Amino acid sequence: MSAEESKDLARRSWESLSERNPDLIEEFYPPDLVWHAPDQDIRGYEEARQYVSTFFDAFPDINITLEDVIAEGDQAVTRYTIRGTHRGETEEFGPPTGRQMEVEGITIHRIEGGKIVEEWERYDNLSVMQQLGLVPEQ
């Protein structure tokens, strides 16, 4: 893929999340996908759907803004901002706090055969926990 095609694929994968349809994962990722999230590795469609659905349940008004998309070789990098209100219970964030959060992150997408086969996700999870009042601010 060209750098522009890789950037477009990474961009569209994020835009699909805004549609809140976990089944769109199959459009951008192969069945053996691997996401390296800050606190766990997600492998395959079922784990990916569960991970995304849990996040949508916790933050039903989630808004994702792509700040930058760059690409070279078989990788694309996205820098984004996620905003949302904690309205659903999850194992990670507990019962709803009703608080808003905003977090910036970066994802490295590795692309093969027109699909994103592996991602490395980095964002400040501590900041999210502090904004939700789950841990004290420092």
Regions picked out by a protein language model, each given a short descriptive name:
Residues 1-138:
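C-terminal and inter-domain tail/linker signature
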